[in-house]
Curated annotation (Swiss-Prot):
Compartment(s) where it occurs, according to its Swiss-Prot or TrEMBL record: Cytoplasmic granule
Positions of modified residues (Pyrrolidone carboxylic acid): Q20
Cellular component GO terms held in the UniProt record: cytoplasm
Family: Belongs to the penaeidin family.
Protein name per its UniProtKB record: Penaeidin-3c
BP-aspect Gene Ontology terms: defense response to bacterium; defense response to fungus; killing of cells of another organism
Keywords (A to Z) from UniProt: Amidation, Antibiotic, Antimicrobial, Chitin-binding, Disulfide bond, Fungicide, Pyrrolidone carboxylic acid, Signal
Signal sequence region: 1-19
Record-level Gene Ontology MF annotations: chitin binding
Cystine bridges: C50-C65, C54-C72, C66-C73
Originating organism: Penaeus vannamei
Length: 81
């Protein structure tokens, strides 16, 4: 019974995916920006690897900014320090 349910699900998923390919066309993935090395004593901003906002940065980047520059992201509050 599980096999039948699984096969029906996979078949319906394949049909949906085929429809999306023809509707939306192929889109390439958006490349990530290159890593920018920090400038010692430089301003806090995108040039030293720590963006001005906490949005859209990875966990490892946020942790790095917190340990190196004391700019720590907090949920709902943004940077502190």
């Amino acid at each position: 019974m599980r096999l039948v349910v699984c096969l029906v699900f996979l078949a319906s998923f394949a049909l949906v995916c085929q429809g999306q390919v023809y509707k939306g066309g192929y889109t390439r993935p958006i490349p990530r920006p290159p890593f920018v090395r920090p400038v010692p004593g430089g301003p806090i901003g995108p040039y030293n690897g720590c963006p001005v906002s906490c949005r859209g940065i990875s966990f490892s980047q946020a942790r790095s900014c917190c340990s190196r520059l004391g700019r720590c992201c907090h949920v709902g509050k943004g940077y502190s320090g």
